[in-house]
Amino acid sequence: MKPAARRKARELAVQAVYSWQMSKNPLDQIELSIVTSNNMQDVDTEYFLELLRAVVRRTAELDAKIKPYLGRLPEELDPVENAILRLATYELVERIDVPYKVVINEAIELAKSFGAEESHKFVNGVLDKAIKTLRKHELS
């Protein structure tokens, strides 16, 4: 699958996770809303669904993995930053086939697109600390 299709999958996944965080609507309802309101032709749909379902299913586990690197309480996170960090944490932990530099770069781009003005700096800082533990095998 082309990198652009993966990027679009991540964009839609962040939007869907954000929607789920804010509304707590059932996952299948959120999936349907995203899929029917977007042109999925240029999206790695399988990757989108994997990211969304895994992040929603494993929220507590992902939050626990990223919490030591936040520098603030998880409940103080901006909901967009939270969605991006959950998604990136899942990729760092489970998608070893995706290089950590790609995960971080994609998360920064998502934060620039959807987050507040300084979100990308915060996301970068958190993930830069997290990779030292979550992807230490790639750093040596």
Swiss-Prot record:
Keywords: RNA-binding, Transcription, Transcription antitermination, Transcription regulation. It holds the Pfam family NusB. One of its GO terms (molecular function) is RNA binding. Belongs to the NusB family. GO terms for biological process: DNA-templated transcription termination; transcription antitermination. SUPFAM superfamilies: NusB-like. PANTHER family: ANTITERMINATION NUSB DOMAIN-CONTAINING PROTEIN, N UTILIZATION SUBSTANCE PROTEIN B-RELATED. Involved in transcription antitermination. Required for transcription of ribosomal RNA (rRNA) genes. Binds specifically to the boxA antiterminator sequence of the ribosomal RNA (rrn) operons. This is Transcription antitermination protein NusB. The keyword DNA-binding does not apply. GO terms for cellular component: cytosol. InterPro entries: NusB-like_sf, NusB_fam, NusB_RsmB_TIM44.
